[in-house]
Structures are given as C-alpha cells and as structure tokens.
C-alpha cells in the first residue's frame, strides 16, 4: 500500500512538473509572438542608406556623436541629446531590415551597441520630466528590442535595466499612460518577462473608460478627449492616443493579451472615434481649437492617420465601410456624416456639411480653454474666446500661424494690443455662462465674454 502511495505521489509530481513546463513554454511563445510583432512594425520603416552612412561615419569610438551636447541640462521641449537615441533607432532598423547594405552588418552592430552603452553610462539629463520618464525610454527601447537575439542575453538584460515600469504612477493618465505602458511592454519582451507585458497591456486597456469628473484626463462621455486638466485635446495628445489604442488592438489580436480589450472597452473607443475625432476634423486638417499648444508645431493641424483607420477596419469589421469612407474623406471625398454636434464637456460646437466645416469654441468655469507650456502657444490667449474655424478646402490655415494676427482670430472679440494675446500657463474660464444646444442638424453656442 505504501509503495502504491509513493508511485501515486511521484506520478502527481511528474504531472505537475509537466504542466508547469507547458505553462512556461506557452508564456515564452506569447513573449516571442509579441516581440516578433513589435519588431515587424518597426521594420516597416524605410531605410535611407545615406543617412545611416552619415551616422556610422560620425559615431565616435566611445559611442557618442560629436555634434550633440550631452551635458547641458535644457528646459522645456529642447533636448538635443535625445537625437542620439533617434539615430540609434534608425541604425538598428537598418541593421535588422533585409534589402539594404547594412543588413546584418557586424560593424554597424558594434556601433549600435557602443551607442547604447554610451547612453546607459552617461544618461543625459533634462529639466523636463517628460524626457526622463517617457521621451528617452521610448526611443531607447526600440534599438534594444531590435538587438534581441543579436547580442548576448547578459548584455541585453544589463541595458534593459535602464527601462523602468512606471505604470504604478497614478499621475500618468490618458496619453501619458499609454506612453509609459509601451515602455513596460518592451521591457517585458526584451527580458522574456510575460508578467511585465501583461502589466503594460492591462495598463493601456485601463485608459479606455469614460472619466466623468471634469478635470479627469481621458475619454469624455460626449466623445471628446481631455489632457492637462479639463482641456479639450482630441487633437495632439488625443490623436496620438487613438493611434496607440488602434495599434495595440491590432498588436494583441489572437494573443493571450487580447481579452484585456473587452467589447465594452472597444465600444467606448469606437464612440470616441466616430462620435468625437471624426467630427473634429475635415479632410487632412484637425480643428485648431482641439489641439492645444500643438498649434505652434509644424504638423500640429494633421488629422488622424489613415493607418489607424485601416487598423480599425480590421478590428471593427461591422463599421469597416465607415472607416473606409472616413479614409477617403481625408483625401478629399465628401464628408460622410454631415450634421451638428455640441461637445458639452469641452465647450465646442461643430457643423459639418459634405463639403465644408465650421466650429466655434468658447470657455467657461467648467473648462480649461488652452495652455502655454514649454514656450509653445505663447500668443494663444484668444483661442477659446469664440474662435471660429471655417474650412472648405481644408488648407485654409496651413502655415498661417507664424504670421497670424493673434488679436484678430476669426470669431473673437479681443483687445487690440500686442500683449493682449500673450498667454501664461493655463487659461481658466471665469464665466459660468457658456454652452450650446443642438438637434443634430443645427445648433446655437454662446458664452459670457
């Protein structure tokens, strides 16, 4: 009898070990699949051999570039040292992508490793927290994941310790959360740690919810998107956010991570796109009242990426025709969903015809009208004070902002003095009265100036 019990126990132990091994193999399979998909997405980029040749020639033996300042701590949006990582990204893509002369180049590999090693040792500082938490890690993670399997695991783990999982920081919300979560996902892939990948994916999925309180950052019930207090940011942060969500929906499709994006979350995201972003743009242009300080950037008016809509055609097949029509509209076809909508959480009204766009933006005590941060949008004070956006071609405001009279923004009533448009920090509304009504076809918007 004792012998039978011993045999039974040994059998149970063997079964447990076998099951554990299968779970481990499945986990590694998922890690490899996710890693492969991420790498494949980076290798879609084109390689400019002349650019790579320039970087390879310039890189010094210690892994630094002679034209970059790694020492000076800059404030705001200036971070010259960050170009180091962007160059390494391009070099790593060239190394991994077949069909160019740098593919599998041993010399280029050594240079990329030297560049990563230099950054790991020196760790250039910035006066802007964003570069430390998000900007630099986002660029650093790409060459590192592209070198997985090309350098020793020991080296890979050593360099990946630079990447930190910051998803536990509750201060990272909306777009900032998807940024830090992407770093965690890459770290998990690099280190063969499926738990980190789960944490990152779950963190991204957690942003797909309605945030009801005014001041909470993220998706609003009216289809608008807020970032930086109760501020309309469907463009800028919001456009980058929807790019991220559509990308990760595609990335996890058919994997163990797909269930984190429940149907409820997908429905919320689809409403954000169809009932929000689609209505705030016209052809290739996004409403300048919904892009915050991005109005000061060269590509600030860019509308949603066609690639994002292509991802959604595959992940929301019931509305594939709607995404296709939207994509055609970006290239000049008639707008597919004409009408009027008032975004009551964001104090903006839009009116669409098949061949025109009109919007008016106001402010109230419930909203933060716009912002000046990092020396961007220095003259944006009047932007939420009745500004009217009128588009028929979609190119009316292309390149105009550097020479605009910011005291005469269409639709506004402003003091005609050079300093009256100057903005410092956030612009908070002081008027309680402000809002609009809409029946879906026509609407009225007003506010107390």
Pin down the residues of each PLM region.
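Alpha-helix initiation and N-capping motif
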Residues: 52, 156, 319-323
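Mature N-terminal, pre-catalytic/accessory segment of carbohydrate-active enzymes
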Residues: 20-80
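Intrinsic-disorder-associated interaction segments
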Residues: 23-32, 44-48, 80, 105-108, ...
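Bacterial Sec-dependent N-terminal signal peptides
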Residues: 1-23
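Extended polysaccharide-engagement surfaces of secreted carbohydrate-active enzymes
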Residues: 248-449
